[in-house]
């Protein structure tokens, strides 16, 4: 009888442990995320009102949330400030390809920025950006362009540097080289018009870095 009780107890314990192993806490708060919410320095995402109420420090503003799995379940947030004008390629070097995809439809700014930062000669715009951030691709800049109005309203509340959406001569570097001339041309982007143009890599333009946040989509 003792043996049977021992075996039954052992089986119960195993089943209990198995159920614990299979239960993983999933944070489903991302379901409520939307453009205009604040990414805080502690990693939390919330409305500006909640951020201020809780005494958190805003770091970036969400401008796209991939609820449909279009870009592998990511959210994008844009920095509260511009980064200073720099060249795409070191002006003291000759022109050469820098290892980006050159794909204007790809959401690969992070990969592109890594290539620019760690290529044989580091790109000035990549070196200028905090390692936590990356320079958006053409496709990612388009997402920012589409959300610029709501993003700017929250940037203003956070005391950040507004996106220049009414300046025709204001351009930002993307991290995408031009497929037709990757050695000496890369794409610049206007948040005023949503237009992008090829530019000489030795040209000076600002960057507006972004971060990506992986959504917890397993629940």
Describe each region flagged by the PLM.
Residues 20-130, 201-219:
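Short, compositionally biased
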Residues 113-134, 138-191:
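An exposed tryptophan-centered "aromatic clamp" motif
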């Amino acid at each position: 009888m003792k043996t049977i009780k021992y075996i039954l107890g052992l089986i119960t314990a195993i089943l209990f442990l198995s159920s614990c192993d299979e239960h993983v806490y999933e944070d489903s708060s991302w379901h409520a995320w939307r453009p205009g919410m604040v990414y805080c320095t502690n990693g939390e995402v919330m409305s500006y009102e909640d951020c201020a109420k809780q005494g958190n420090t805003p770091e970036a503003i969400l401008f796209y949330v991939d609820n449909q799995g279009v870009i592998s379940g990511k959210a994008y947030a844009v920095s509260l400030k511009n980064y200073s004008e720099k060249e795409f390629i070191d002006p003291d070097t000759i022109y050469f390809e820098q290892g980006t995809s050159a794909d204007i439809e790809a959401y690969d700014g992070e990969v592109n920025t890594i290539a620019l930062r760690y290529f044989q000669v580091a790109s000035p715009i990549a070196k200028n950006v905090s390692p936590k951030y990356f320079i958006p691709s053409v496709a990612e800049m388009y997402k920012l362009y589409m959300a610029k109005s709501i993003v700017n309203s929250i940037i203003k509340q956070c005391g950040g540097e507004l996106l220049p959406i009414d300046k025709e001569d204001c351009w930002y570097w993307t991290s995408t080289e031009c497929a037709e001339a990757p050695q000496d041309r890369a794409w610049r982007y206007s948040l005023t018009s949503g237009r992008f143009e090829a530019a000489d890599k030795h040209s000076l333009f600002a960057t507006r870095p972004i971060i990506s946040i992986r959504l917890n989509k397993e629940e």
